[in-house]
Amino acid sequence: MARLQKLYREKIAAELKEKFGYTSSMEVPRLTKITLNMGVSEAVADKKVMDNAVADLTKIAGQKPVVTKAKKAIAGFKIREGQAIGCMVTLRGVQMYEFLDRFVTVALPRVRDFRGISGRSFDGRGNYNVGVKEQIIFPEIEYDKVDALRGLNISITTTARTDDECKALLAAFRFPFKN
């Protein structure tokens, strides 16, 4: 069992149940999945770029990502239908908690000029999205072997019904919110 998963079961769930006045323990918000998405616009010109992006995301997530393809052709972006334009990976269970632990304790402090993450990136349904500008903040990525700096989107899906519940859950996991 992952460290944050144990913390959730022993401490966080009880605190949230008391704070929001839930009658059942099944009402308490919990993490469902974490989705990592990397859009690779350079893959249109060079196919090898996609292989490097997949390798980076594999190192970060610990499992092989699926290559996402364009749903329709867009002439302005020089994209054809079915062309590889990104990669994504969905983490659940123990891997999800392990990634979250590494992200909060190791990766976020390595961001340049880090002052906390925005508390306004909630979607209104209890989910949180955060963008990372450089993949080199993760310790699994070796700086010397990176061909290009790529950003990625991290989407945290929870069972929370409101943004306040989700923010309380993530704050209990020691997310460094700005305000």
Curated annotation (Swiss-Prot):
Please provide an example of a Pfam family that matches this protein in its UniProt record.
Ribosomal_L5_C
For this chain, the annotated S-S bridges are none
Q: Which UniProt keywords apply?
A: Ribonucleoprotein, Ribosomal protein, RNA-binding, rRNA-binding, tRNA-binding
Highest taxon of the lineage: Bacteria
Record keyword Ribonucleoprotein present: yes
Offer a single GO CC term for the protein: ribonucleoprotein complex
Record-level GO BP terms: translation
**InterPro entries named among the record's database cross-references:** Ribosomal_uL5, Ribosomal_uL5_bac-type, Ribosomal_uL5_C, Ribosomal_uL5_CS, Ribosomal_uL5_dom_sf, Ribosomal_uL5_N
**What GO molecular function annotations does the UniProt record carry, in alphabetical order?**
rRNA binding; structural constituent of ribosome; tRNA binding
Q: How does it assemble?
A: Part of the 50S ribosomal subunit; part of the 5S rRNA/L5/L18/L25 subcomplex. Contacts the 5S rRNA and the P site tRNA. Forms a bridge to the 30S subunit in the 70S ribosome.
> What biological function has been recorded for the protein in this entry?
This is one of the proteins that bind and probably mediate the attachment of the 5S RNA into the large ribosomal subunit, where it forms part of the central protuberance. In the 70S ribosome it contacts protein S13 of the 30S subunit (bridge B1b), connecting the 2 subunits; this bridge is implicated in subunit movement. Contacts the P site tRNA; the 5S rRNA and some of its associated proteins might help stabilize positioning of ribosome-bound tRNAs.
The family note in this entry says:
Belongs to the universal ribosomal protein uL5 family.
**Protein name, as recorded:** Large ribosomal subunit protein uL5
